[in-house]
């Protein structure tokens, strides 16, 4: 009797456990479905807010062109600085000789040597060396910093081979890429406005960076001088023009973003100097600071901007560049984790850490073509410490990456279209004239989806008639080789030869 009662009791308990288990399982399934529905709503809302149809992109391009004209009309007339670079002549391909470049823009700098052989041989030989800047020199003095640079430059010059020696009496010439804000006064002169990127040498602000470098070079006994002071965007334009004379503009799509282009000097009202012989002038747009009510920005863009070191500034750059796209994805995933069960019941602690998800991580996930999206899973585990994710979650993460990358690529295309539109008013026959846009930077170079989307969007904006006449070409290392090419283009010896032959 007792045994039967015990068996009955056990059966009842098992049945109760089964019922409870079934109820819990049903609740979990209902919760999972509710979470999936909420995730789908959030994704759809994101996609709608990031949508950039061609009609909207044309409005963005119109606004870009209008801001360009306003920036050219007067200093401070636009959010675009539209800086006159004093570069009025770009490499032709006929330059000959050996030229140097110094690329200083962060915690490392590079020195380059380029041997040019004219139109037939072009770049014969190219050497470069990268050097790390000790931390203490970033806040020491201009004298110590530039002396360190000059010592490295002198060692690099000393490594010239027999085939690199200059003719007797010839001075070495250097193109200087300085990627900090400067007020340029001539092609080879510019005063530092402020430091960025961990540099803090206060006494250097307001000084001529070229004069400081030339002085340090002389102290090393080097017979060398700076021929051209440029930034990486202008260098990319020079490198693009060197290989293709139809190059009209250059765009950098990397950690940051910028553009430069060739305009008619008489289309620059704020230019008060004598018109250059070429009739042209390269303009450094500083287009990252562009803003417009037509930009399809989301709450995530607004929050990122408000919490950035420069709120209200570089709004366009914050939607298209490598510094920020990965962070936008992180912010979106964090909101999804807070409002749904995308990553389970708890929010992954690392997901709350700003800038932990880089655009490099984003592009690796976005390029995952495996059937189970294993690369996405591995990245989420590696970067955010998320041990397990379902296929649905991985697909959602990929879709978020696609929404941000697509918007960024389409907005970058709109910026390029704005430049073409601005120049169109000076083109005799824009439908038949071939135009090349030189592009460099890690986002363009490595984020294949981004670059392809940007190019196809630009074609859509141009239309069937104009699209074949505009080409985007990747130009590698404009900040290095481009600077050396500008040194060659403005060589005192090249100028003398031109004068003799005229």
Swiss-Prot record:
Membrane topology: Single-pass membrane protein
Residues binding D-glucose: 196-197, 231-232, 258, 286, 317
Superkingdom to which the source organism belongs: Eukaryota
Tissue expression as described in the entry: Expressed in roots, leaves, flowers, immature seeds, endosperm and seed coat.
Chloroplast among keywords: yes
Chief subcellular location: plastid
Record's keyword terms, sorted: ATP-binding, Chloroplast, Glycolysis, Kinase, Membrane, Nucleotide-binding, Plastid, Plastid outer membrane, Transferase, Transmembrane, Transmembrane helix
Residue ranges of the region described as Hexokinase large subdomain: 231-477
Domain Hexokinase residues, every copy: 37-488
Pathway: Carbohydrate metabolism; hexose metabolism; Carbohydrate degradation; glycolysis; D-glyceraldehyde 3-phosphate and glycerone phosphate from D-glucose: step 1/4
Record region (Hexokinase small subdomain): 92-230
InterPro entries on file: ATPase_NBD, Hexokinase, Hexokinase_C, Hexokinase_N
Membrane-spanning parts: 5-24
Locations listed in the record: Plastid, Chloroplast outer membrane
GO BP terms in the entry: glucose 6-phosphate metabolic process; glucose metabolic process; glycolytic process; intracellular glucose homeostasis
Catalytic function, reaction form: a D-hexose + ATP = a D-hexose 6-phosphate + ADP + H(+); D-fructose + ATP = D-fructose 6-phosphate + ADP + H(+); D-glucose + ATP = D-glucose 6-phosphate + ADP + H(+)
Enzyme class label: transferase
Function: Fructose and glucose phosphorylating enzyme.
Protein name: Hexokinase-9
Species in which this protein is naturally found: Oryza sativa subsp. japonica
